[in-house]
Amino acid sequence: MFQKFDVIVVGAGHAGCEAARASALIGAKTLLITQNLNSIAQLSCNPAMGGVAKGQIVREIDALGGLSGIVTDQNTMQFRMLNRSKGPAMWSPRAQVDNITFGISWRKYLENVPNLQLWQDEVVDLIINSGAGEGVVTKIGLKIESKTVILTNGTFLNGKIHIGETNFE
């Protein structure tokens, strides 16, 4: 059904969206797999972008050409500068965004990226050859081959970390 991809990105949260877009924009034939195409870039716990720590990451992604900051700006409902009572080094912008339109905006951007395909399914296994990820097996039984696999599935591993074939819990 699928031809071989250069890159498969598993998970369409913020990291997966940025990774898939970056991969496709440099010319790699990329597949982004997510459990639900209607919850791309979902802000599960707190619909905010920014703050002291997350804000630094968003600014770094923005400097590297990512979309998180742009999509945030387009969907901001309220903006606030945090820590104004402290010195300027601690000031940090934070935007509260519309949780629904944020994901819709991300999906629209991704659907228009050349070399990028979106697929709704659950990855249940990795295809490993000589210690390298060379594809995935999905819940509906598809075996999709690629040159590399990027796992950005966040909390869906229940805190399990994979580094190569080594696992930590």
Located regions from the model:
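Conserved N-terminal/central alpha/beta ligand/cofactor-binding core
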Residues: R21-D125, N129, T152-E169
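Glycine-rich, N-terminal phosphate-binding loop of Rossmann-like dinucleotide-binding domains
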Residues: A12, I140, N153-G154
